[in-house]
Structure formats: C-alpha cells, structure tokens
UniProtKB/Swiss-Prot annotation:
SMART domains: HTH_XRE
Matching PANTHER family: CYTOSKELETON PROTEIN RODZ, PTHR34475
Domain called HTH cro/C1-type: residue spans: 19-71
Family named by the database record: Belongs to the RodZ family.
One Gene Ontology term, aspect cellular component: plasma membrane
Domain statement: The helix-turn-helix (HTH) motif in the cytoplasmic domain of the N-terminus is involved in the formation of spirals to maintain the rigid rod shape. As this protein is anchored in the cytoplasmic membrane, the HTH motif may contribute to protein-protein interactions to form the RodZ helix, which is localized beneath the cytoplasmic membrane. The C-terminal domain may be critical for determination of the rod shape by probably interacting with enzymes required for synthesis of the peptidoglycan layer, including PBPs in the periplasm.
Organism (species): Salmonella schwarzengrund (strain CVM19633)
Topological domains annotated Periplasmic: 133-334
Protein name stated in the entry: Cytoskeleton protein RodZ
PROSITE patterns: HTH_CROC1
Any one GO biological process: regulation of cell shape
Length: 334
C-alpha cells in the first residue's frame, strides 16, 4: 500500500517539483546546480518552476532536464510523461528560399539586358561599316567617272592638236614663198644675206612642226626676213627675246610622288589640265588666277603656288577627293 501511494504521489508531482526536492535532499543550491551543468541560474529556476523559456528550443530544454535528473539521481523514465507536457517536441518551420529564386530571376533579367546590349552594339558597328563602304564606293565611282571624262577630253585634244601643224605649215609656206621669190639685190653682200634667208625660213618651218604653239612667232620671224638681209645682227637678237619669256608670278608647279588624277581650271573656265599624272612626274601650268583644282589622291602630289607650298593635310587625313581654289595674291609694285 505504501509503494502504490508513493507512486501516485510521484505522478502527482511535476518534473520541476521532483527535481527541486531531489536537489534539496542532496543539499545543493540552485547556484551549485547551475555551475555543474554550465547553465544560468535563471534557467535552473525556470526548470524547477515548470516554465518553458520562449527563447529556448524544446530540444535544448529536454536535454537540460535530463542532465539535471542525472545530477540529482532521479530516473529519467519517471520524468518522461512530464517532459512531454512541459517541453513537447515542435516541428521546425522551414522558411522558403526566396532569396535563391530572386537571385535566379535577377540573373535571368541581367542576361537579357546583356544580350540586348550586345545586339545594339552589333547593329551600330554594322551600320557604321555599311556607311563607310558606301562613301568609299561613291568616291571610287566619282574618281573613275572623272578619269573617263578626262580620257575623252584628252583624245579630243589630241585630234584637234594633230590638225594644228598642217594649218601652220600651210600658212608658213605661204609666208615664205614671197621671201624666196623676192628679187636679189645687185650688191654681193645682199645676195649672201638672201642666200641665208631660205635656210632660216626652213629652220622656222621645222620649229613650227615640233612646237605648234610657236607658229605665230616663227611666221613673224619668216615674214621679217627681208629686213634681216639689211641688218643680219637683228635676227639673233629677236630670237633671244622669244626664247627667254618673263616668268609668270601665278605659275602653278606640281610634283607627283605616285599616280594621281587631277583637273585644273583657271578663272576663265579653261581647263589647263585634266587627266592622269604618273609617279615622279612634274607639271607646270600658267593661266588666269584663281585656279580651281580637283585632285583624286591628295597625298600623291606636292603643289607650289607663287613660290609657296599649298597645304593639303586636311584632305590627306580624310582620304577624300580634294576640291580647292587657289586665289591670286597681289604682287608688290616695282
């Protein structure tokens, strides 16, 4: 009867009461139990008062109670029913991993943004390349067209230039015929001079064939042959005056370091030159300023105007057809 009464009494006592009674029987204080179990005094007090701290997990609380029971020699099996009531096991709540899905969604968005950026970059590069190619092709077509036009003009100039010596030769023969058929004077000195006149006439005729532009000068010299018979020293003087003309201050001098097409027009609209110049070639032009120039390859030509070099660097940098006008500078009065 006493055993059953003791068992019923133990069941009536809670876990905290039984642990406190066992501690008091052993003469231990709460401080001593806390030091041996490495717990806080407040935790030991909560266990004896059957309190479950809110900041303490049930798993840890059950472990502390078992350690306390072993310390005060209380069987753990007797405390199990009370443990289920005092510290029931609670299922742990698992929070959804929102950060992972958020990071994945953000990474996907960044991938789309990067793809769009690369697409825009490729489009810009493609448009730039197409624009450059169109400009380059247009320049090449323009140069080809100008070269074809200059070739046609050169052929026309050659055809007209071949007819000039024939007309000049006829005019020269007409002018020299009276000089050859003129009656010879009676004096021996005059006959000697008349004998030299046909030779000078023949020489003038040969010069007109070689240089058509001097036909008028040679014709005038031939028509003046009777006057030369009277004063033989006058002929060399007049020839020297024709051979050494005065230098034109508006002369245009060009030296070519590579093949280059160009067109030069003076103020009257006359084309002084239009065509292709080869490497190491030189070109001296004289006309009425200002000059208008079109140069296919500015880097291949060096220009001097009025003794000063012409700056073509702005055309060389852009690698375009040079179009410029050279204005005449006033010369100082002498």
């Amino acid at each position: 009867m006493n055993t059953e009464a003791t068992h019923d009494q133990n069941e009536a006592q809670t876990t905290g009461v039984r642990l406190r009674n066992a501690r008091e029987q052993l003469g231990l204080s709460q401080q001593a139990v806390a030091e041996r179990l490495c717990l806080k005094v407040s935790t030991v007090r909560d266990i004896e008062e059957d309190k479950a701290p809110s900041d303490l997990a049930s798993t840890f609380l059950r472990g502390y109670i078992r350690s306390y029971a072993r310390l005060v020699h209380v069987p753990e099996e007797e405390l199990l029913p009370g443990l289920e009531k005092q510290a029931p096991l609670r299922a742990a709540k698992v929070a959804p991993m929102q950060s992972f899905s958020l990071g994945k969604r953000r990474k996907k968005r960044d991938g789309w943004l990067m793809s769009f950026t690369w697409l825009v970059l490729f489009v810009v590069v493609g448009l730039t390349g197409a624009w450059w190619w169109q400009n380059h092709k247009a320049q090449q077509e323009e140069i080809t067209t100008m070269a074809d036009q200059s070739t046609a003009e050169l052929n026309a100039d050659k055809d007209s230039g071949q007819n000039v010596p024939l007309d000049t030769r006829d005019a020269t023969s007409q002018d020299t015929t009276p000089a050859q058929t003129a009656p010879a004077p009676a004096t021996p000195v005059d006959s000697t001079a008349a004998t030299q006149t046909p030779a000078a006439t023949a020489t003038a005729t040969q010069n007109t064939v070689v240089a058509p532009s001097q036909a008028n000068v040679d014709t005038a010299a031939t028509s003046a042959a009777p006057a030369a018979t009277e004063t033989p020293s006058a002929l060399p003087t007049s020839q020297a005056g024709v051979a050494a003309p005065a230098a034109d201050p508006n002369a245009l001098v060009m030296n070519f370091t590579a093949d280059c097409w160009l067109e030069v027009t003076d103020a009257t609209g006359k084309k002084l030159f239009s065509g292709m110049q080869r490497k190491d070639g030189n070109l001296n032009l004289t006309g009425q300023a200002p000059y208008k120039l079109k140069i296919g390859a500015p880097a291949a030509v060096q220009i001097q105007y009025q003794g000063k070099p012409v700056d073509l660097s702005r055309f060389i940098r852009t690698n375009q057809v040079a179009r410029l006008t050279l204005n005449a500078e006033p010369t100082p009065a002498q």
